[in-house]
Amino acid sequence: SEVKKAIKNEIINQLDFRFLNETWPEFDLSKPDGCLPTTESLVRVIWKRLKSHLPLKSLRLYENPKLWADYKGNAMDAYLTVQTHFAAAHRLAREDLPQNENEKIFGKCARPNGHGHNYIVDITVKGKINPRTGMICDLSALNSLINDLVIEPFDHTFLNKDIPYFADCVPTAENI
């Protein structure tokens, strides 16, 4: 197809098994507008190289299965997503309903002693690509925030009992 041909010719054949810092002029740091080939910068440069060949709406580039960047053609705006996980137990039930009603509404999640899930969380931040660093945020700081605000508080807890917010709120995926 034309899509595969454009991607192969304009991107894959030029980048595969190459040292990114020296492959394209956009990554030449001796030039005033040269940038580092971070995931965020790379997805933006790929967009610029493909836009004359394809009717792009958005572009996603995976650095690895748990880290990717999205670009939608808007100047230096990009999105960075970190995927992580935590394990937690919960019981979905309303105290004002009998057990059989809770089971009809919430299924196995209404078991009297609760049960557990392995939750996968995608956390996406939007920002401007910094011309000096090629990044939209400090990835180490973002990972620390995710750990402090999501993983540590929720991992291996019984949400209904260990997280005060869920004392009066049913811990559905939407509420978590």
What are these regions (language model features)?
Residues 1-176:
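Charge-rich, low-complexity N-terminal segments
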